[in-house]
Every structure is written in C-alpha cells, then in structure tokens.
C-alpha cells in the first residue's frame, strides 16, 4: 500500500501525510511540482522527526510517476469529490496506491481517467470536501483494515 500526493500545495498537509505514512509503514509518493519547498519549516514542523522514517519517493511530474507506476501490478485509487463509488464499498488490495489531489484544485481530467477507481467520501448536503490529509487518513485506515495492513503491536 502506498499514498501518492499529486502536486501538493499546503506544506502542513503534506508533512502530516508523511508522518502518517511513517507511523503506519505506508510509502509516500510526491508528484511534483509542489507548491512549497520540501525544506519549508511548516512542512518539517508537521512531519516532525518522523520524516526520517518515511519511505518517500519523489517524481518530477505526473508523466514520470505514471511511467513508474505502470510498471507495477498495483491499482491507482483516486480519492475525489467526483468519485463514482463510496470508499467503504470498495475492496482494497495490498498493492493499491491511494492518490489525493491538490488541495486547491484536485487533479486534471487526464489523471482522473488514469485511475483504476475513483472513490468518494459521503458528506452532508452542501459540504464540498474534507481536508486532504483527513480524507487520506480515513480512506487509508479502511484500506489497511481490509488488507490487514496495520503494523503489529510493539
């Protein structure tokens, strides 16, 4: 299981997701360009000292990420407000990569159509979306539960 961040533009969210990945043993793919420098103090503060333990792969562009990903046997699972299936109804597999879009704009249509599945988190009427880090944590938790992928107790 991996978590991919498409051109993240809020350093605190990216840092929080990298901390989540480090703590749960889930690799993180950063698809650049980012809206901040990876040396940004807000990014480092959110990730704290967990960043040293995170499995982080940086990709210079969507095309480079997609090329690398296509060589794997995994599925690309997009979390989107325009999803066609609720995340809790989806059957996750250990080789899945969960993809979240930019906080400000989501992902372009070409990325949307490249995903093997497009999942949505149901919200109350009139609510647009959750924070990207919160949404990723919710769905990652369900994916790890389904695949028995949580790390063992220390």
Placement of each model-derived feature along the sequence:
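Post-transcriptional modification and biogenesis factors for structured RNAs
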Residues: 1-154
